[in-house]
Amino acid sequence: MIQYCNLCSEEFALHARGRVPTDIWRIWEDGIFENFEAPIWRELWSEVAKEYRSYEPFWQFMNELVARAANKSQFDT
């Protein structure tokens, strides 16, 4: 999970710096969201989230994404 979240944070940072076009970022973001629709991914995020607290923009992005994924998951069942 840490390795995957590290990759996600790098992708997030590249987009934030304008190094990745928005259309590509949206594809990556959709993929991250799809993974976190699974409850196990959300549980694991809650365990590793503290590791990303020092990178506030990414930490906030992930918390919002995980909340959206949980909400969508709740209505899909």
PLM ranges: what are they?
Residues 1-77:
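Amphipathic alpha-helical "stem/stalk" segments
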